[in-house]
Amino acid sequence: MRSPSAAPIRHDLVLVGGGHAHIQVLKRWAMASVAGARLTLVVDRPVAVYSGMVPGFVAGQYSRDDLEIDLRPLALRAGARCIVAPAIGLDTGTRRLVLDGRPPIAYDTVSFDVGSTVAGLELPGVREHAIPTRPIGEFVRRVDEILAVARARDAARLVVAGAGAGGVEVAFALAARLRGERRGHGEVLLLESGPRVLPGYAASAAARVLAAAAARGIVIRTGARVTRVETGAVHLEGGERLPADGVVWVAGAAALPLFDGAGLETDGGGFVRIRPTLQCLGHDEVFAVGDCAAWTAGPGLAKAGVYAVRQGPVLTHNLMARIGGGHLRSYRPQRDFLSLLNLGDGGAIGTKWSVSVEGRAVFALKDWIDRRFVRRFQVLDREGAITPDFAAAPMPGGDMLCGGCAAKVGESSLTRALERLGVPSHPAVVLGLAQPDDAAAVETERGEIVAATVDSFRAFADDPYLVGRVAAVNAVSDLWAKGVTPRFALAQVSVPEAEPARAEETLYQVMAGARAALEADGVTLVGGHTTTGLELVVGFAVWGFAASADTLIRIGGAAPGDQLILTKPLGTGVILQADMRARARGEWVEAATATMLRSNAAAARAMVPLRPSAATDVTGFGLAGHLGEMLRTSKASGVLHLAALPALPGAVALLGRGIRSTAHPENARARRAMLVEPDAARHASLDLLFDPQTSGGLLVAVPRERGPALLSALRAAGDEAAAVIGEVAPPRPDGALIRVVATG
């Protein structure tokens, strides 16, 4: 997250896509950024796939960990914002990048490294019955579908449409995988619409492919143009129907619709035209590299990853030079490049100029090149440990305080301050300081019960739209926990000091996110207040109406025998802290983000008809703190089962590595009122009890006989992680509020 002491932002550089060139920009930026420039990475998913290793993955030579690059920690190492949202358009007039599902973002300079899609998807049945190899990340996720088809039949026929380099490698990879799984009766059929395989490659390389295919039982047909795909078959031009149990579509590159209507000059295929500096023609502020770009300073370049790799250093220099006022360099593509085709079984074909070679040594070279390249950008391993290549590099985050609900005053400090203050009284107060709860409630002179709450926190990410959404979801949660439907809200936003246009953009993004969340819950934003300060702080006052004082679900009604049900998984605190340090995998942060964005509205609607004894929402004080308050107010004790706690992916692993939210030590004071059994003291999930939650779930005490019905209703409503985590018990003679056991 951007430090409040950082230089004022004067230039917004936005990278769209996590391709082979942009990852080089990120790594270089981590070593030497440009003062006053804010770097933003926009991707549709937080993981990039190295395309050169995908055939090896299909063949079973690599795991996903071998070929995936986690973009989020790489971006955070560079001090960049990371926004996960598909880019769907560009407005060059206003310099806005159009995103799917959220407002456009502003740029001063924008660079595209978004690749391409597969040609021919518009043909009948292709989208429905074939698996395209682009987007490459989606193809990797669907490889198991292809293999499942082959495994389900003794003599499955897999058809690969397109015999360029990609199609050849996929066909050989599938054949090798079938042989490796002893499914030798399966058949791989490679179809090419043109007169020969490997169009554009040396004839000697094509001859080697034909010979290697014959030796491995791969059938190749040229002059076979597919016109339609249906369940169980492909149709060729001329009317021939070929049986096919599975179809992989590798029929060349096509442009993405991203640049349609953007006012950028494109070639006949829709690829954006660039000059040697990698800038788009007529728009110096727009750069493009890799497959999405069309080269204009000479013969067109093949759609091959090697060009994006070689463009990376030039792009990095030119982006920095444009911001800093330096001289831009020209990219000079090589006249030919070494192409290495994986045959899937330990061999490979290499070709450059008109020469081709084949053998295990060729694959060994390819494997060494590919693994070395990917390792340069892998910040974390599968378990979240820092990889050797990044172990010595400076860590972002430092001693920065956590944002979100971890930025609250600790429970003990809050309690002592209120005790010193004293409790004012008024006959209209139904819930107030005399009976602390998640929300306040007062009775009007007309007998209406108005429930209200206020909540705010420091930004937990450099994404004001996301912060606004989460802050709104978090604020209304207090009312949902009381069984009250929120109706109206006021905003309180402190925007970091900046030039007027950037301050306006920050405020707009915050309020757009907040409004999206509030309106989804039926809440109308009716006003608010803004200030400027050192950092972004977002809060809301929210109120609604209860039918009567008796319908309020209070925190203090839990009774012995009640089941304790938690509706959301735990771990947002440690994941957000790890994210500040670039120590959290992108998929972990995405899971945490999804749970923070999930409103407790559905859970409340499932809860209210089943008449719970008590409820609260789990936020900054952690599960132990909020449960302790429930039990203390209810004059009861409770039993928690650590094995039953739902946890976000990565949370327990990060806690095991010693990472803690800055609020964790204060929350851990709750252990003084706990009896932790010896088996629980050694349990990996113990520290989850003290992890501060941002926009956490509801903690519900419900009579045991209604517990199963509530759990079923919660899961049916979308709270799939909801779980029974313990039970309420009578007060203990030793005074302990919570007894913690490992298992039930």
Name every feature range the model reports, one short phrase each.
Residues R2-S3, I9, D345-A393:
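C-terminal auxiliary extensions adjacent to catalytic cores
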Residues D113-V114, E237, V250-A251, V289-C292, ...:
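Short, well-ordered coil/turn residues at beta-beta hairpins
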Residues E128-D154, G232-H235, R241-R310:
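FAD-site-proximal beta/loop scaffold in flavoenzymes
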Residues D260, C292-N342:
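A conserved FAD-binding loop/helix module that cradles the flavin
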Residues A391-G744:
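Helix-biased detector of long, well-ordered alpha-helical tracts
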Residues R2-R10, G79-A161, V248:
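FAD-binding core/adjacent interface of flavoenzyme oxidoreductases
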Residues R2-R81, V160, V168-Y201:
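Beta1-alpha1 glycine-rich phosphate/pyrophosphate-binding loop at the start
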Residues R77, C82-G89, G93-T94, I105, ...:
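A Rossmann-like FAD-binding core segment of flavoenzymes
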